[in-house]
A protein has these predicted regions:
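N-terminal secretory signal peptides that target proteins for export/translocation
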Residues: 1-15
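Short beta-strand elements
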Residues: 163-181
């Protein structure tokens, strides 16, 4: 055995190493170029002629309390019944002030004040005090691109709370705003 044999690997090891590196590179390329999954956007055919598109996310406010944020768009036939954001706080922890407006800010210049509004199929007596709902079509149709949002939710008996919404969630909401039922 010569000293060169110790430095230069055998040909079978060279091919094995190259194959391993090629496989690792291939997996990394697949992961890097994979399209994002919209697993949280769902379509419901609730009854004949009625379709609802929905995105549901779990978000946290500045006090680290969990909120469920659901954006849904309901069609009766080809007629849109509205695009709504429903916020659900933890029962017993918060009571939403339905007399106050939801404040939506982009952190730059855009600001919206959205009043409490129910969709036609939800009776007011059904929602408990930890739930609030807002018609947000004007907001989502006005957004040029998905950017972080700050939702300031008015509360009863305490100061308003702020919920930060990540751009990927806003992108789902914009996708729902731009979705139309198939004829």
């Amino acid at each position: 055995m010569t000293p060169n044999d110790l430095i230069t690997p055998a040909p079978q090891w060279r091919w094995g190493r190259r194959l391993f590196l090629a496989l690792v590179l291939g997996v990394l390329l697949l992961l890097a170029t994979a399209a994002p999954a919209w697993a949280s956007i769902h379509t419901y055919h609730e009854q004949p002629g009625q379709t609802t598109y929905r995105s549901r996310q779990s978000l946290r406010d500045q006090r680290d309390l969990a909120w469920q944020a659901t954006v849904f768009k309901r069609y009766q036939g080809q007629t849109v019944q509205g695009l709504y954001l429903r916020l659900v706080g933890f029962p017993g922890q918060v009571a939403v002030d339905r007399q106050g407006n939801l404040q939506i800010d982009t952190g730059t210049t855009a600001h919206w004040a959205v009043p409490y509004a129910l969709d036609p199929q939800t009776p007011a007596s059904v929602l408990p005090d930890n739930v609030s709902q807002y018609e947000v079509s004007a907001v989502l149709n006005d957004m040029p691109r998905p950017i972080p949002l700050t939702l300031t939710v008015p509360l009863v008996g305490q100061s308003s709370t702020q919920i930060i919404v990540a751009p990927y969630v806003v992108e789902e909401w914009i996708t729902i705003a731009q979705t139309f039922p198939e004829p």
